[in-house]
Amino acid sequence: MTEFGWRRFNFFDRSVVFDKDDPKQKFMGLKDVAVDCWCSSGGSVYLGEAKGGVFQLTNQFSEYYWKAYQKSLASLHSADKYLFSIGEDDETVNTLLKIWDPERVEKNTPHVMRTIRMSPLNPTSSSPACSIAVHSSLQSVVVGYTDGTVLFYQGDVLHDKSLNSRWIKVRDSSVGEGSVTGLAIAVLPASKTVVFVITQKHVHSYVLENGRTVIAHKKHDANGATADCWTFDESTGQLIVASREMLFFYDADQCIDMDGGEVGRCLQLGRGHEKLQLVASGQYLALLTKHHSLIQKERDSEFMTMLSVYDIKGQYVGFSCSLPNLCRLFIAGSTMLVLSHDGLLSELIEKNLATKLDILVKKSMFDVAVLIAKNSRDGGDYLKGIHAKYGNYLYGKGDYENAIQQYKETIGMLEPSYVMKRYLDSSKIKELCIYLECLHDAKRDNEHQTKILMNAYAKQGEKKKLMEFVNKITDGTRVSRMRDVFEILLKWNYLAEASLLATKFQMHEDALNVIIHHMHKYTMGVTYISKMPIESVIEMTGKFGRDLLIHARDDLMHMLWEKIQENTDAKKNNFMRIFDIFMGDMDASRVFLSYIENQTNEHDEFIIPILECQMRLFKVNSDWSQERLEEDIYRFINKKNEDAALQMAQLFDCTPVIEHILMRCHKSKELMMYHQKKRDLEAIIRLCQSCSKEEKRRLWLDALSFIGKHATARDELIIIDLLKEIEASEQIHPLVVLELLAKNEHLTISSVRDYIIAWLRKQQIIIEEDRNTIKENNKAMGELDGTVESLKFNAQIMQVTKCSACDTPLQLPTVHFLCKHAYHVHCFESYNMDGSDKCPACQTTRDTTRDEEISYHKFQKELAEASNGMELIAMYLQRGLFDEKTKKTKKSEAKKDPFSTGRASTTTNPFDDDEVTTISRTMSTVSSNMATPSRQRSITRKDDDSTNPFFNSDSGTRLSTYDESKNPFGAPAPSTNPFD
């Protein structure tokens, strides 16, 4: 340790310089050189002798010598690549300022660019110049004299012609203070220049404005110094002066301040010893002090030199050693060289950074290691590792607070979890917060660490710090998920702060959750929702509406009413999305639905919820009048929603609505199934009575089938009424009715007795009518036989005068038929599309009659061969055998075209099938062959009896079973033959 407490290290190695030509021999090139002044420039150092010689020594230890002055050399200074010198060439006082270009050598001497005579510039004194300083910009130069006079010039030092004349006197002569031993120039902003003047007794500073006027002068507290005991750093503007007791530090910018600057910062380095030389090299100050020699080997070795290298910023001694005899110190490039009295040259080589740091770490001097690493160019690579070791060192000693300060500096290198595990104990939570804060400031945190920090604040009760941290997050200076922050505030019951945070970041759902569920401020919640956009109002009301409806009913309903009035576009703002909150509160539901109905006329999207509400009411109390059903339910049902309404009605078992929807959709079958499922016979009968005529038959059959399976004796009266309706409708054959009802084991004969008796009476009447019809038909057949006989054996006179097709008088050529129809030839050809010789007017009637006959015979044949005749009859009944209305309708359709040559596409006979149709198409009922159109036939020819359907093919006798009603010619017309 030094006398003032600085630590001492050995960061330099002192080694003797050997001759580069003969490495085994020591370098003795500077032996017997008496160095009186020196300066360093680039990689070279210039050593000046008092006799005028200059030695140039490079950092590769190459030598060069030239004679700068013939008589004496007083001072050397380097600026840029140039060398400036002050000296005398003759015995008289005639000081010369020479500017050298060392890179340009002529005749073994550097080129002299300019030579300025300095004595004429100070005519009031005969003292020679002894000191010089030039600014590195080569725009200003200052020269000092032995009598204390100082001259200053501002301009281009290399080229200005006025350099020979226009100098400014900065300081007058002061013989009492002695000669000027040192000069320095500092250029400051605002065109100000500070000139430091060092004499043997004092240190002065002069402030010049625009390089012409001295505006300030200060005399500092240092006692002056010799020419080798001061140093100046132009980059920082700092002057360091070494006196016997102290080292003084003066800054150029402080000299401008009128209130300070006289007293400089000082350090007691080498106190009590004579200072021989002060040299600055980088961050180090090398100081040579004179000491009494403790080991005297020679007669002139009374004194020795102590070399000390200081790091002022780090406050430690980087190197120190004693040197026998007196020595000189100078800088060549970045190397410090020591020239001993006997001409031995030594160099101080700084150890590499890793070695220095290793030394410090081993000595646990981490603070110095940190400082050295910070001041080194490559120290950043080691800095975090040093802090980590320093932190571990302090943590091991129990100094957790200072240890965390070191761990802070390891962010980016040391895994945060390593540090956090050490400080998870509750007693160290304060230090953990410090580390996590730095981690967040460095933007190397994650969400988990943010949560830990906020929870640590809350656990300590540091609400202020917690909120400051939250504010930093919300201000954007920290990055974190707002939801995590919100959840932590909510966890530690900072409800107001949590709600404000959620509000600020538009976390509306979270804000309302705090306000309603935690703070229980329901009115505030309604107010909060009312200030949101309409879409958010609907969404938030749907989520929190139930609680608000319970605790702030009036406020909520009023808010909804206002929003509905303000937003009438039902397509964009569907308020029915929040209808679920009213479930269970029928009064509120009705009020809300009234709001919705008044909102817009186009409320299709609202109908289903409205219907649901009304059906819920119906389920509670089903005693509704038809008018109320119409007003509250039926009027809302339309084609778009009838399916959804039907499903809802089935869900709530709303029978009137189900009946209404199915009836309006003409879904009588589904309605029948619904009534059957409920086993409501009365409703089934009502349905059958109210349905259309087209559906009655099917519905009666469904009803009878249901009764046959599920009816009981208690339903006898209802069944009797049902049979009356069936009897009145005449839609179902009684045999089918009896067959379906016979399947029920519970019904008695009394249920169908009246129905059977009534049917039998009707059948008796029909039988009597059929008998009368048969008699009439037999009579007609007899008349028809006479007509046929007349046609076969008597001459026929054709007396038709008009065409049966165009109803105009006949003109030859004509075509006459035995059926009393006549046609123009061209009219006949128009209607005779198939080329046959049949009467167009009678052809359709004959075909239909023949089809009926064939179908009848086919039915008789099937009935005779059937094993179960009743089953066959029932099958044909289902096909409409006795459906007279259907027969008449289809017959009338077939007769629409009296000249149709083909059969109707759909037969009216229920016994028709493909086989019958084929047979009917191959048979003809016409017994006579017609003549060709070109030949008029006036009389009939005798037909072959074998082709006559009215005679037996074997005996030729007349058939006794001939049915006159099947004669296509009808009853015979009165004879017009005058010979009959």
Swiss-Prot record:
Region listing for Disordered, in residue ranges: 886-980
Zinc finger (RING-type): 803-843
Localization (cell): Late endosome membrane; Lysosome membrane
Compositional bias (Basic and acidic residues): 886-898
Keyword field contains Protease: no
A GO term from the CC aspect: HOPS complex
Keywords attached to this entry: Endosome, Lysosome, Membrane, Metal-binding, Protein transport, Transport, Zinc, Zinc-finger
Heme found in the keyword field: no
Phenotype upon loss of function: Increased numbers of germ cell corpses. Reduced number of gut granules in the adult intestine. Endosome/lysosome fusion defects in coelomocytes. Double knockout with either sorf-1 or sorf-2 results in larger endosomes and larger lysosomes and thus suppresses the endosome/lysosome fusion defects in coelomocytes in the vps-11 single mutant. RNAi-mediated knockdown results in a reduced number of gut granules in embryonic intestinal cells.
Highest rank taxon of the organism: Eukaryota
Topological type in the membrane: Peripheral membrane protein
Subunit: Probable core component of at least two putative endosomal tethering complexes, the homotypic fusion and vacuole protein sorting (HOPS) complex and the class C core vacuole/endosome tethering (CORVET) complex. Their common core is composed of the class C Vps proteins vps-11, vps-16 and vps-18, which in HOPS further associates with vps-33.1, vps-39 and vps-41 and in CORVET with vps-8 and vps-33.2.
PANTHER family: VACUOLAR PROTEIN SORTING-ASSOCIATED PROTEIN, VACUOLAR PROTEIN SORTING-ASSOCIATED PROTEIN 11 HOMOLOG
Family designation: Belongs to the VPS11 family.
Protein name per the record: Vacuolar protein sorting-associated protein 11 homolog
Recorded name of the encoding gene: vps-11
